[in-house]
From Swiss-Prot:
Organism per entry: Aspidelaps scutatus
Subcellular compartments: Secreted
GO cellular component: extracellular region
Keywords per UniProt: Acetylcholine receptor inhibiting toxin, Disulfide bond, Ion channel impairing toxin, Neurotoxin, Postsynaptic neurotoxin, Secreted, Toxin
Disulfide bridge partners, by residue number: C3-C20, C13-C41, C26-C30, C45-C56, C57-C62
Taxonomic superkingdom: Eukaryota
PROSITE patterns registered for this protein in UniProt: SNAKE_TOXIN (PS00272)
Annotated protein name in UniProt: Long neurotoxin 1
Main localization (coarse): secreted
A single MF term (Gene Ontology): toxin activity
Phylogenetic placement of the source organism: Eukaryota, Metazoa, Chordata, Craniata, Vertebrata
Family the entry assigns: Belongs to the three-finger toxin family. Long-chain subfamily. Type II alpha-neurotoxin sub-subfamily.
């Protein structure tokens, strides 16, 4: 699997990591900078805390930056 790890960078995931994910959450600067984003690979869709949005997918490069 190939997943984004930053808005313009992607990588080949480790063996067994077949899920791409994109986490989004607000911090103190959310109103001016927007949500913080975390991209990556995982074996399963990560569990998140309340207030954190996550989307998981299982095709190459399926976790792009939402505004690009």
């Amino acid at each position: 699997r190939i997943c984004y790890i930053a808005p313009y960078d992607h990588k080949t995931c480790a063996a067994g990591e077949n899920i791409c994910y994109l986490k989004a959450w607000c911090d103190a600067w959310c109103s001016s900078r927007g949500k913080k984003l975390e991209f990556g690979c995982a074996a399963t869709c990560p569990t998140v805390k309340p207030g954190v949005d996550i989307s998981c997918c299982d095709t190459d490069n399926c976790n792009p930056h939402p505004k690009l």
